[in-house]
């Protein structure tokens, strides 16, 4: 099969031939039909953490072509008859029901940390069966490819870290979840019972668009009114004011007075904020629009130097989306330890999507070519801290990104067998 392989020494990646992978216990072999690009993919190709030979890339969508053997019958450790085990059995039942020929989407951690796990930018991938979700018939492979990583990033920040009501059940009795609820109750503002105000910096980013939708789902489930405020380029305002985002107030992020305008629109400050950019001075500025007891989530780590801590008034809550994979993650000399609760949260979220959780995918910019064009075009367009966004290209597909997801179609050439799930 063809795959996009990291060349760490030269800070790039190239398409190479690799053997077809084999699914292990509780894993699926998936023929990739589309991949979506995230800034982290470009960042850690041009500024490598992984070693040469790793498959890069995160988001994928495709067809299941084979299943690995079932897990041993012992199941989960420390299983109890509580609601936790019921939820786990539900997620396990979903993963067991996914069969050859099903359309699924998911994400992997490709060359974004110090490990040997392969990524998604390949003709075939192997993924745990409980970390994919069924693509509804109304959604294309190209649309679905851009959902998994960014939507989970949004959900983790909102429900696991900020403590908003989730529109799906997860391990609410885990130690981490209980601590989050206690923190939320301690910091709760009396006005929260009537209306909560929520601010998104970067409302037209991929993560930001899922944040808005999930905030609306949360408010509906909890029976609350929500005042949704955001910053974005004015050319995206009409889209963001319409459903499913339905922003009440939008401001231009380039207007230096936007924090003052947000405080005015929220009558003194917001209850919650989500910084979907989290770089340089954005975290400081977002922290100034929180009311007393307000909380904010960020998508990048201050310890890794993504943003400046000076002047930040409220300690932001950070976590890596990779926590959902249930594996130890090491990058920037930090270790993000595996967490059963965070893995359970991810599987519950993807089960919700499979069961019909209604999220509108980001608008897609379908890029020409396939794997061979990702570095040359897609990564150049995304840019990184090492490679600035290319403004010199004049092709239509290379225009600046705004409110879109970059997606490539992948054509798998190898055939697969049938019946027993083994590769032909």
Give residue spans per PLM region.
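Terminal helix/beta-alpha structural elements that buttress the NAD(P)+-binding lobe
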Residues: 1-24, 31-63, 73-77, 81-93, ...
């Amino acid at each position: 099969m063809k795959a996009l392989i990291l060349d760490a020494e030269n800070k790039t990646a190239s398409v190479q031939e690799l053997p077809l992978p084999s699914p292990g216990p509780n894993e699926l072999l998936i023929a990739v039909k589309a991949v979506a690009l995230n800034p982290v993919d470009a960042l850690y190709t041009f500024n490598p953490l992984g070693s040469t030979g790793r498959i890069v890339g995160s988001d994928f969508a495709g067809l299941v072509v084979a299943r690995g053997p079932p897990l041993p019958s012992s199941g989960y450790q420390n299983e109890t008859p509580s609601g936790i085990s019921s939820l786990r059995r539900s997620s396990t039942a979903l993963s067991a029901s996914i069969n050859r020929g099903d359309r699924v989407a998911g994400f992997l951690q490709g060359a974004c940390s110090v490990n040997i796990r392969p990524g998604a930018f390949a003709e075939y991938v192997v993924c745990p069966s409980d970390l994919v979700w069924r693509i509804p018939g109304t959604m294309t492979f190209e649309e679905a490819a851009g959902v998994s990583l960014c939507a989970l990033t949004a959900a983790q920040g909102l429900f696991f870290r900020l403590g908003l009501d989730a529109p799906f059940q997860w391990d609410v009795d885990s130690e981490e979840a209980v601590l989050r609820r206690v923190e939320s109750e301690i910091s709760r503002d009396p006005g929260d019972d009537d209306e909560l105000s929520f601010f998104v910096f970067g409302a037209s980013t991929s993560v930001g668009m899922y944040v808005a939708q999930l905030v609306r789902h949360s408010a509906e489930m909890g029976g609350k009114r929500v005042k949704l405020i955001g910053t974005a380029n004015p050319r995206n305002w009409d889209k963001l004011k319409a459903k499913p985002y339905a922003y009440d107030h939008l401001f231009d992020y380039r207007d230096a007075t936007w924090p003052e305008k947000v405080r005015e629109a929220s009558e003194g400050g917001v209850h919650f904020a989500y910084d979907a950019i989290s770089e340089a001075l954005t975290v400081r500025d977002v922290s100034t629009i929180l009311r007393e007891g307000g909380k904010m989530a960020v998508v990048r780590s201050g310890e890794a130097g993504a943003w400046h801590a000076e002047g930040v008034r409220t300690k932001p809550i950070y976590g890596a989306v990779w926590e959902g994979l249930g594996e130890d993650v090491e990058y920037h000399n930090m270790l993000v330890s595996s967490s059963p609760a965070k893995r359970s949260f991810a599987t519950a979220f993807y089960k919700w999507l499979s069961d019909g959780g209604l999220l509108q995918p980001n608008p897609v910019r379908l890029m020409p070519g396939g794997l061979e064009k990702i570095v040359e075009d897609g990564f150049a367009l995304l840019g990184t801290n090492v490679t600035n966004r290319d403004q010199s290209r004049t092709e239509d597909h290379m225009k600046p990104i705004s409110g879109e997801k970059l997606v490539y179609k992948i054509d798998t050439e190898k055939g697969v067998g049938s019946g027993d799930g083994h590769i032909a």
